[in-house]
């Protein structure tokens, strides 16, 4: 009888016993070590710095922000024109017979926001955004809505009037002017919302290949003499319950990560001495109505800073801000900014600023090093150039 050949075993009984006893120990060690750390997500941009993108694996939705820059309003008439176009833009997005039904069919969640220097359209989707859909959206957005423009202007005038009747809003709003320019709403709408003017930021669980073809323009409508409107804001006479004083200055253009770092650090260095002075003031006289608000408004050309003071006996603001600028203040401001950068919240809002200023996509990664390199003397010079410039001005509204 032939003997059957035995197949060689991969592991002996002793080795199997060792593996069985040792495997739980290995699993325990791996669990204690925790998951492998993931590198920070890198922001990328196309060659024209029009589309900024960041892959966030743990994010379940795709988020697309569309940014349309425009100059800040210099007077009430220009503000009225911008508000009119913004209201028409919102109607175009929301009315079912305009873009409302089309957006619903895409399954997109839509939010709009109007800022001093740009309009922002935020889209959320559980499916990737495609070139053709985004291109179609931008081209349709350039088409004005079918609306009674005279009635819309009257409604916008009334809304502007109600806002400017508020003392604080009136003081921080653009001033009134004796000039009342005319407007062709169809042509102006199409000009302000050209596809080629939009910038994009995009985050999602996987990269998308959006291309510059989405910015191809649509034909602009011909001007119509029958639709010429006169931009005449309604006069207001606001009354304040407490002394109000506005301090406003321009913010410089941002061309690099260093400019961006100075802009952000400068804001923190304005907030610190104001908060410190106000805290002492309220401790000494808690019954006094005293406070402040600071608006740091980003625009394509730099921005505007508006400081509104409430109450009396405030010190001279330029002197206060410059005298309180010490090395420890710079370090505190730097750490506050680094804490903001490390947080996950507001990640895409940082990218929106990169797109608005068209900065290199690695600017946020370089920001900690740029902040560390900014010394006291550089920030003194930067802040002094803002507070002592010809563009610095003050307005007051007595109670």
Q: What kind of feature is each model-predicted range?
A:
Residues 151, 217-233, 293-296, 327-336:
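A generic structural motif
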Residues 44-88, 217-280:
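His/Glu-based metal-binding/catalytic segments typifying zinc-dependent metallopeptidases
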Residues 158-253:
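Extracytoplasmic/periplasmic C-terminal soluble domains
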Residues 143-147:
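Short, polar/flexible loop-turn hinges at active-site or ligand-entry regions and domain interfaces
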Residues 1-108:
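A generic N-terminal leader/anchor concept
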Residues 60-82, 98-142, 155-180, 197-202, ...:
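M16 family metallopeptidases and their MPP-like homologs
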Residues 51-56, 107-112, 187-189, 233-237, ...:
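Short beta-strand/turn micro-motifs at beta-sheet edges
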Residues 2-52, 183-214, 338-399:
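C-terminal regions of mature proteins
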């Amino acid at each position: 009888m032939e003997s059957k050949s035995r197949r060689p075993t991969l592991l002996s009984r002793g080795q199997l016993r060792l593996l069985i006893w040792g495997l739980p120990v290995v699993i325990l060690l791996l669990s204690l070590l925790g998951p492998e750390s993931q590198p920070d997500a890198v922001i990328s941009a196309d060659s024209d710095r029009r589309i900024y993108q960041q892959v966030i694996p743990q994010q379940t939705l795709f988020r697309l922000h569309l940014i349309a820059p425009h100059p800040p309003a210099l007077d009430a008439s220009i503000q009225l024109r911008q508000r009119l176009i913004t209201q028409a833009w919102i109607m175009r997005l929301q009315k079912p017979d305009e873009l409302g039904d089309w957006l619903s069919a895409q399954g997109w969640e839509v939010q709009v926001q109007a800022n001093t220097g740009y309009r922002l359209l935020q889209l959320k989707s559980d499916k990737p955004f495609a070139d053709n859909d985004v291109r179609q959206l931008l081209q349709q957005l350039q088409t004005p809505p079918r609306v009674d423009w005279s009635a819309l202007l009257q409604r916008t005038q009334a809304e502007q009037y109600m806002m400017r009747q508020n003392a604080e809003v009136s003081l921080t709003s653009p001033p009134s002017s004796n000039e009342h320019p005319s407007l062709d709403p169809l042509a102006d709408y199409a000009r302000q919302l050209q596809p080629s003017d939009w910038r994009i930021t995009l985050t999602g669980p996987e990269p998308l290949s959006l291309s510059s073809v989405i910015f191809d323009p649509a034909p602009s409508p011909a001007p119509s003499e029958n639709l010429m409107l006169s931009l005449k804001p309604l006069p207001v006479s606001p009354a304040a319950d407490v002394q109000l004083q506005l301090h406003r200055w321009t913010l410089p253009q941002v061309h690099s990560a260093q400019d961006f770092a100075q802009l952000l650090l400068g804001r923190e260095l304005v907030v610190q001495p104001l908060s410190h002075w106000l805290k002492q003031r309220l401790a000494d006289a808690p019954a006094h109505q005293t406070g402040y608000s600071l608006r740091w408004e980003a625009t394509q050309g730099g921005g505007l800073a508006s400081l509104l003071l409430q109450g009396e006996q405030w010190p001279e603001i330029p002197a206060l801000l410059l005298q309180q600028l010490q090395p420890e203040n710079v370090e505190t401001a730097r750490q506050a900014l680094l804490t903001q950068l490390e947080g996950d919240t507001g990640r895409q809002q940082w990218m929106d600023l990169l797109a608005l200023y068209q900065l290199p996509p690695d600017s946020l990664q370089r920001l900690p090093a740029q902040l560390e390199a900014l010394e006291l003397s550089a920030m003194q010079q930067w802040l002094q150039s803002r507070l002592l410039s010809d563009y610095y001005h003050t307005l007051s509204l007595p109670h």
